[in-house]
Amino acid sequence: MVAPAHNYESRNILDLLSLKGKNAVVFGGARGIGHAICSVFAEAGANAFIVYNTTPGEKAAKEIAQANGVKTYTCKCDVTIPKEVEHAFAEIQKVFDTIDIVVPNNGICTGKSAIDMTYEEFANEINVNLLGVFNVAHNAGPIFQKQGHGSLVATASMSGVVVNVPQQQCAYNTSKAGVIQLIKSLAVEWRKFARVNCVSPGYTTSDMTGGKFHKEWEPYTPFERNGLAKEIASAYLYLASDAASYASGTNLIVDGGYTSI
């Protein structure tokens, strides 16, 4: 079983939320929500390994290390290619003696309807958003099992729970629903040695959304605004930390109330 975090009841809540001395790996960590996750983890004391594909991560890694006094590393990896994911974990294990936290944050969205998109576009979204999470988890699981501990926090989406409007994005919605069910399945399979959770962001200003606020989304959200990347990243901190030592199989929705209406 996964026991409570060490001295859980006697520790201050701020200490439980601290990641000091822990090693975190964030796939898709060079930009957007992934970059915010790396920054928040580093602020909490974790060393960070940024795994990127299209956006080089060296600049982000250097800035995060300098700002927080932690160690950061990078490597390039296409999560849809199993051999590349295996290679990434081999590189990670060269610098981290333990891997405490893994975040599969890879994701794309073409924003096309089922009629307009091609077979190849649909398959590509499933490959990146769902199969990519599996490929990362497939490599993280044996490491967690050998260590006897680990926390995997994947990026799902409110789109995996509801069909959000006004845009049409059937492939994205389908892939993120799959991520949520995959995480629940892994939480049960890995119950003896790891915690597995996911965060489902709502409409967020990030690189995926062009780095701008989308006014057309605001009327659909009770808060009448888009979320900030750091507001989303804070949820990952909780699930990755010792404070969440009884949380597994959780889909933490952070959407400004969108899925409540």
Curated annotation (Swiss-Prot):
GO molecular function: oxidoreductase activity, acting on the CH-OH group of donors, NAD or NADP as acceptor
Protein origin, superkingdom: Eukaryota
Pfam families reported for this sequence: adh_short_C2
Alphabetic keyword roster: Cytoplasm, NADP, Nucleus, Oxidoreductase
Main location group: cytoplasm
InterPro entries according to UniProt: NAD(P)-bd_dom_sf, Sc_DH/Rdtase_CS, SDR_fam
Cystine connections: none
Stated name of the protein: Uncharacterized oxidoreductase C22A12.17c
Species this protein is from: Schizosaccharomyces pombe (strain 972 / ATCC 24843) (Fission yeast)
